[in-house]
UniProtKB/Swiss-Prot annotation:
It comes from the Eukaryota. Residues 1-13, 71-83, 245-248 are cytoplasmic. Residues 35-49, 105-223 are extracellular. It comes from Homo sapiens (Human). Plays a role in the cell surface localization of ORAI1 and may participate in the regulation of Ca(2+) signaling and the VWF release in response to inflammatory stimuli. This is Tetraspanin-18. PANTHER family: TETRASPANIN, TETRASPANIN-18. It is a multi-pass membrane protein. One of its GO terms (cellular component) is plasma membrane. The keyword Glycoprotein applies. The gene is TSPAN18. PROSITE patterns: TM4_1. The lineage of its organism: Eukaryota, Metazoa, Chordata, Craniata, Vertebrata.
Amino acid sequence: MEGDCLSCMKYLMFVFNFFIFLGGACLLAIGIWVMVDPTGFREIVAANPLLLTGAYILLAMGGLLFLLGFLGCCGAVRENKCLLLFFFLFILIIFLAELSAAILAFIFRENLTREFFTKELTKHYQGNNDTDVFSATWNSVMITFGCCGVNGPEDFKFASVFRLLTLDSEEVPEACCRREPQSRDGVLLSREECLLGRSLFLNKQGCYTVILNTFETYVYLAGALAIGVLAIELFAMIFAMCLFRGIQ
């Protein structure tokens, strides 16, 4: 009876580790996709160093889970106590790290508010300065999504650095200008009229709504996946310790 129980635990351990292996592969794939996504999600993430760090953490955690899932499968099949103990300790560390990251994300969620983005834009935006990472990122976001500022074109009335650099000669940056719908090269409808703030020639929608909608799509997916991975890790640790204690 004890042998049957041990055998059952062994196969359950293998199954749960296989799911960890798949979960790690999914996290790794999502992390890679976020970093190379051609639709502009990378630019949105790059606008906030905290989020960019999160993307790299996603890549690292995905790769680590991928390897540990493989390690756990080997430990279960070979019934190696050393591998099982090594697996348990590392899964425990990862589990605690993921839990801590989730708590920190909840605590610092105010960094994603409309007020935060507006404050950063009006304080640091420099217009068409490609050497400034912050400004270049915002320009890329506004061009990609056809939006202007955080709330709309009026944000640039309070962008102190932008106003100083343009000597108040431009109401909005060129990135806010509307482009020819059929143009592959992004030809502007009228650069002069746009920079003067003529509403027919600039994008009036703020980028915050676009960013929020984009994040809602990915955050729910990532959140559901993270909960699933945490649950699998918890069961895997239980099975690993039970199998470890059952092996003579």
